[in-house]
Amino acid sequence: MAAKEQLTAMEMIWGFMSGTTGHMGKTDFAPQKEAFGNFASPETYFPRVVPESEGISSEKLTQMLRELAAARHTDMHHLLVLRNGHVICECNFAPYRSGIWHATYSMCKSITGMAAGFLISEGKLSLDENVYDIFEKRNGLLQKILRPNLTVEHLLTMKSGVQFNEMGVVSGNDWVDSFLNAPVKGTPGEAFEYNSMNTYLLSAIIQERTGMKMVDYLRPRLFEPLGIRKVFWESCPAGITKGGWGLFLCPEDAAKLGVMYVNGGKFEGKQIVPAEWVAASTSVHATPPEKMGKYGYGYQVWMEERPGSFAFNGMLGQNVLGYPDTGVVIVTNAGSNELFQTCEMLDIVRKYFGAEFGAELKSGEAESPMAYQKLVQTCRDLEGAKETPGRILRGGWKRRTPGPRNSGTPRQIDMAQLLHGKEYKMEDTHVGMFPLTLQVFHNNFSDGIRRIGFFYEKGRFFVELTEGEKTQRIEIGLTGSKVVEWVENEESYLLGTTGQFAENEDGELVLKLEFAFLEEAARRRVKIIFQRDFERIRLEWNETPGKDLIIEGLESLVTDVAIAPLLPSRFRERSLDMIHLLMAQTIEPMVEAHRVRPGEETETEEVAAEAESAAAVENTENAEETV
């Protein structure tokens, strides 16, 4: 990545660490994400059958589900297993619900690859076309003289060598221009270097050649023939489909893509994607580093362990896995803290469906009603799973004597009623509801929470949050999750909310809240500790996944030999360990708040608000300091 883009990324990270709220980076924001709409009646396309009817034992699937649920680095959201176009296992891990679309992240790169395949089959593009020729009007004199031979195939295989990558998108609105003017490492075609902007440029090429957004180009060619109606794909500030990320898709619709590819591009007997493109895209054209994947990379498609198998792979656990020789397709959505193929979740799947799978396959196993019921019950347990409520302790941790088991309802309701009408003003407003990772992914930045209130009305418990000038009331599930809407700068997101009351070792009342972003990989958690007879509270926030990913990206920037001398002095003067600590405190912040009565705004608080505003301005100025 060029120095300008790196510095902009560092400025944004410093803004987070110094408590800046509101829009950051140099990319314009305009609300675009659509509300999902009705999820009460999820659409199903594939028939549901007993696994044994497709030659796979229910016991095998039960064991795999249990391993996935127990895996330390895996946070499963959805799992679909199909064979021969029949669903043999479906599980939506609580609080995630059936029929809701989910962010695909890089999984959608494979769909962008399909779009390129369509355009090539229509004679409007070729693999060996020079990318700079496609955008001839954008080329300056220097590019015309010195440009390398960068082809469409180099983009498809992640071998472009172009140094404008994902982190650079915060630096401005014209990503095509930034890509075309970026330096190239080595010679295109020599080395695999994973870069989402290669896929973005494929989308830009499709728009350049067709005059329409890629998502619109795909509707009559892919989405409509497959019956995919609930689909949303983000655009960049210039109105180009992002291509390498930004797609929301339901698991059942993702399965249609896998079934089609397993069948050589056919769906319901009709050729959708050209068979030649399916074969070419699922053949090895590049060798990634082993830490990313061990089996090779095709045209925007990863190879898998079993010979002939493939993966549409997205970070944090979004996958469509296809096994053409067995007719098996597996769809996963998750919030795991891992990238690429080398991960705990896929290791578990490979254990059951990888290279060794197939020896026990039969046209139809003898049905085992007991094993099947065990599978059904396991799915039900995982779909209704809820953490066991904590013990209510008496006398502090050292002198603990178990109180009555906090099983529900009476105790939880008592605590909720006790909090009714209590409102608090934050003493630091740099923390928002929207997870930091999602703020960056969607270029949608929080204004920070100013107030929080608690209300119990007609048997329902609510938390009220004020961010900026907007107040939103969220219902909290005390005995199971509740599905509510959260609006972040006019973009709608579905939340699964749960709450649990307990006491800490000091005898203080604690409220643990979890906000699962049901369309995303992220969860937001906060532990609220009530102190001094409810006059003060302390809020301890965290999000998953997030910390490790952000710190890894930060470390790569700070240790870059080319960029280090250009960094703001605040970064050069701090050790890497100190920067890690600051970032960890940013992702897992602790905030204090004091109680205010309804409508109360004292002169002292107004002065404090002015001080907070002045501090935010100073933080912004500090964040923008460069040598």
Question: What are the language-model segments listed below?
Answer:
Residues 430-544, 552-559:
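Substrate-recognition/cap regions that form aromatic- and gly/pro-loop-enriched pockets
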Residues 57, 123-127, 164-166, 207-219, ...:
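Structural helix-adjacent loops and short alpha-helical linkers that scaffold large soluble proteins
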Residues 160-235:
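A small/polar active-site loop signature that marks catalytic segments
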Residues 278-333:
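Active-site Gly/Thr loop motif
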Residues 122-160, 181, 212-245, 249:
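Active-site helix/loop module of the DD-peptidase/beta-lactamase fold
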Residues 85, 103-128, 155, 202-206, ...:
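Active-site SXXK
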Residues 1-97, 120-125, 366-412, 416-429, ...:
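N-terminal leader/targeting segments and the immediately adjacent pre-domain N-terminus
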Residues 198-205, 243-266, 318-335:
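Active-site-proximal alpha-helical segments within enzyme catalytic domains
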